[in-house]
């Protein structure tokens, strides 16, 4: 199960997710007993989408069922579900409520029992200045990280919005899905560091990169057992509507193809629609440097093999990729 992380303050909302899908299978222990463990199926399955509607911009992520043996694909379903939900009225609040109804209808119709949480984090622009908001719909996760035992037949919707007026600075951190991967001392220290960056309103790339590093540290290497992996994606939604939504990708290995989050625009115009599967690719990996590499200390040699220090090669802070 995916780990989805939401980080927001007055400046931006950041949503992160690892890209692994996995299956629970039986393994043999050294003492001859058997146990169940999560085996990776796909290390590069995108679970993030940017969503723009008439009154809001949000990043969207999901955790839970990704695919089924019958051919259901949650990433594809989410695009069509968001468009169906927003079509009658392209505003965030009614869209989320209709998305809850669609999820109850469609996920409930799948054979078997399937957990799913869909998270939407960003800003409502009907307020001035824009209002930070976090919505999620789920059939197994509630408020305060509460989890229900059996999967519920109907999805529930939840919302957290920025308090106004408030003397306290606004920031929030929330995680969904494989939260057990963060129940260790290193992850708790990482969480405290990220919380400090949020409260101090540090640049978006500093907050995102620290959180991505923490998520990667908690994940298993490619092919290793575990519910989450080290290949991760990110969406950054600025609170200022004139600033572009940006996307990112963190890899634990050299990659010559990089896929970016999906996009849905539903503002009540003829141009409404969705895109999926956008990627950059080197046509000939034998002739081109990798597009993404494992992050290393700034003064170490870059893993791409260029012989240049990481900070002057793939570790340079470049202009963001715009969504």
Regions found by a protein language model. Name each.
Residues 1-288:
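N-terminal nucleophile
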Residues 276-323:
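Acidic/negatively charged segments and metal-coordination signatures
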